[in-house]
């Protein structure tokens, strides 16, 4: 599964910036370690802390912002979900076994 979010936040200098991030496997694994929950739990609903942590993790991995999570979170102005891509968006290719 891949999620895409657009996050508007303030830089350390106070400038508003908008960043679009694609959340992938490494981000979900980090979220599982932090939250002590499984990614399947997100199917029941995703909270603000879930979304912002996933975005922060990707932003820091992409070296866009180096602040710790709590400091960065205080600067977030808005978060928008852009899309969800399934883990297997197409049907499997035919094989000799089918």
Question: What does each model-found stretch correspond to?
Answer:
Residues 1-18, 29-48, 53-56, 60-98:
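Charged interaction scaffolds used for protein-protein
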Residues 22-25:
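Flexible glycine-rich active-site/ligand-binding loops centered on an Asp-His dyad
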């Amino acid at each position: 599964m891949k999620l895409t979010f657009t996050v508007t936040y303030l830089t350390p200098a106070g400038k508003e910036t908008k960043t679009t991030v694609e959340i992938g496997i490494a981000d979900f694994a980090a979220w599982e370690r932090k939250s002590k929950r499984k990614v399947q739990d997100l199917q029941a609903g995703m909270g603000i802390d879930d979304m912002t942590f996933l975005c922060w993790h990707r932003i820091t991995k992409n070296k866009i912002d180096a602040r710790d999570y709590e400091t960065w979170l205080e600067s977030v102005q808005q978060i928008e979900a852009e899309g969800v891509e399934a883990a297997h968006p197409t049907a499997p290719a035919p094989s000799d076994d089918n």
